[in-house]
């Protein structure tokens, strides 16, 4: 019937929306998420990424966040929830893309359906779908669409989505390259047109992005953050293969615990395709692209979201494995329905705290939620006044929640950003500290729930000493709810005086506490 081919994709979309929606939108706002939200807030005000906040990843995630902030302004909704809703929509669409990819590669609707249901069970992806903005959530959608259109030989669209994935995370440029390579190696009669369409699709998003930053007078900032910093200053943890493999294992085992067996079977199914004879083109985009994330992961694997790039392969591989097994039975439809129900049950069980509490803590490092963070941010204003000047050197969540502007683009200084500051700010790192002193922040946020790195992590010895020397006489560390801040000692003293005045009016004997504070 007309439109019948859309029924199952729409049902999968609705199912994904239901399952992911069960996680709720109140998950903790992690440091990295707040960087993209802050950039999105500033972009909605007309300030482009890299100018508003320095970052070394692609511009697409803050642009998507900026779109969400603009929508919140249009509808009068909360900007954090609206941005999360936009990223949630990309996650739901990713499930549909996985279905279409599995169906196209293995020419089986059952394989596509089981692949989508398998994908719903990947906890590390599902949890972040509503608690972001996790920048790699839309990456999976773009990756799956790039592979889907390459499988269908729709070169422009494959190149377009591969290019968008590259603008989200630089290593994804491998997918755009695979599209171009496949197009350029088509038979002679197809080659010219295919190559031209692939090149046009790849070029279009890049040219639009470059034009945007050029128009904003920020092309140098874009090129520096997107490309140069990663070669000149970026600092990571262990880079030895053994260390990387240990990190990868620890960040896969628990966050994906309920689906480890399907992941393993799915990956092995994909690997088996390399030896399948006779070989068919429909497998080629998947097989040519698959080594790229493997090679990158051997070089740099940090957290569970670094495994996202493998999820489409694992999902369609496991879906194909189950579909092939079902075809060998007497009643494949009934067994497919049973297996689908089992996979859906796992996906639903993942939403229960009793099942996923360990995985959740591994992903976020805290049990704090967004409402708790909001309360703490408001408490900061209540304690020190709404006119309090705020800055961040490692924890911009407070700036996002209170809609405050940082005095400079450096919301975090780990991972080699201190060397970037030293190279680009007039007067170097010490000049940056002098500029910060001129701004005279009453409080500087530096740590929050779920973080693992202090602002001193990865700093050079000289920069660590300079920061410590500058902070010690002026500020004292103070915990307010889930946040740690360096608060000016003068502000704390003034607060103590106010509290003592109130206490003395109720109990004259309480004046001694002020002397204790002044002596600190």
Features from the language model and the residues they span:
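Membrane-interface helix-loop-helix junctions at transmembrane boundaries of multi-pass membrane enzymes
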Residues: 2-4, 104-105, 187-198, 265-288, ...
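Transmembrane-helix signature of polytopic, membrane-embedded enzymes
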Residues: 4, 98-123, 140-141, 156-157, ...
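Short periplasmic/luminal acceptor-recognition loop of GT-C membrane glycosyltransferases, typified by
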Residues: 56, 158, 177, 354-357, ...
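Loop-to-helix entry region of an early transmembrane alpha helix in multi-pass inner-membrane enzymes
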Residues: 59, 63, 74-96
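Multi-pass, polyprenyl lipid-linked donor-dependent membrane glycosyltransferases
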Residues: 60, 86-90, 114-121, 125-145, ...
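Membrane-interface transmembrane helices that cradle and orient dolichyl/undecaprenyl
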Residues: 138, 143-158, 184, 259, ...
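Membrane-interface alpha helices of multi-pass inner-membrane proteins
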Residues: 143-149, 155-170, 175-183, 203-204, ...
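Hydrophobic/aromatic-rich transmembrane helices and adjacent perimembrane loops
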Residues: 293, 299-334, 338
């Amino acid at each position: 019937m007309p439109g019948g081919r859309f029924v199952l994709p729409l049902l999968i979309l609705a199912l994904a929306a239901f399952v992911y929606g069960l996680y709720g939108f109140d998950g903790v706002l992690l440091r990295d998420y707040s960087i993209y939200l802050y950039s999105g807030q500033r972009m909605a005000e007309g300030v482009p990424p890299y100018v508003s906040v320095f970052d070394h990843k692609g511009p697409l995630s803050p642009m998507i966040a900026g779109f969400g902030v603009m929508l919140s302004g249009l509808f009068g909704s909360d900007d954090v929830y609206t941005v999360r809703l936009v990223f949630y929509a990309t996650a739901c669409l990713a499930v549909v893309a996985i279905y279409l990819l599995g169906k196209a590669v293995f020419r089986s609707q059952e394989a596509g359906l089981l692949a989508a249901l398998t994908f719903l069970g990947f906890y590390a992806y599902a949890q972040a779908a509503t608690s972001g903005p996790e920048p790699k959530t839309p990456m999976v959608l773009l990756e799956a669409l790039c592979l889907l259109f390459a499988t269908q030989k729709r070169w422009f669209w494959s190149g377009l989505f591969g290019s968008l994935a590259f603008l989200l995370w630089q290593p994804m440029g491998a997918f755009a390259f695979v599209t171009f390579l496949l197009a350029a190696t088509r038979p002679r009669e197809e080659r010219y047109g295919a190559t031209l369409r692939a090149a046009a699709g790849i070029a279009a998003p890049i040219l639009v992005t470059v034009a945007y930053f050029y128009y904003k007078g920020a092309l140098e900032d874009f090129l520096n953050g997107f490309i140069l910093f990663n070669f000149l200053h970026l600092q990571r943890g262990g880079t030895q293969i053994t260390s990387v493999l240990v990190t990868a294992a620890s960040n896969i085992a628990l966050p994906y615990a309920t689906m480890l067996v399907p992941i393993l079977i799915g990956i092995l199914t994909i690997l088996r395709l390399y030896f399948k004879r006779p070989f068919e083109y429909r497998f080629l985009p998947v097989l040519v692209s698959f080594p790229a994330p493997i090679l990158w992961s051997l070089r740099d694997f940090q957290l569970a979201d670094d495994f996202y790039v493998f999820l489409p392969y694992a999902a369609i591989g496991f879906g194909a494995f189950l579909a092939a097994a079902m075809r060998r039975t007497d009643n494949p439809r009934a067994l497919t329905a049973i297996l689908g129900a089992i996979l859906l049950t796992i996906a639903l069980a993942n939403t229960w705290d009793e099942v996923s509490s360990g995985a959740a803590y591994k992903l976020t490092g805290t049990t704090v939620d967004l409402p708790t963070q909001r309360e703490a941010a408001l408490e900061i204003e209540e304690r020190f006044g709404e006119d309090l000047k705020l800055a961040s050197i490692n924890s911009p969540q407070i700036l996002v929640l209170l809609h405050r502007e940082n005095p400079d683009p450096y919301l975090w200084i780990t991972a080699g950003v201190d060397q970037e500051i030293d190279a680009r700010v007039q007067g170097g790192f010490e000049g940056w500290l002098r500029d910060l002193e001129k701004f005279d922040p009453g409080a500087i946020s530096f740590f929050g729930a779920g973080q693992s790195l202090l602002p001193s992590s990865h700093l050079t010895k000289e920069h660590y000493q300079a920061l410590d020397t500058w902070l010690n006489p002026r500020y004292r560390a103070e915990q307010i709810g889930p946040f740690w801040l360096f608060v000016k000692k003068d502000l704390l003293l003034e607060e103590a005086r106010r509290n003592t005045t109130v206490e003395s009016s109720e109990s004259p004997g309480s004046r001694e506490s002020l002397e204790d504070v002044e002596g600190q």
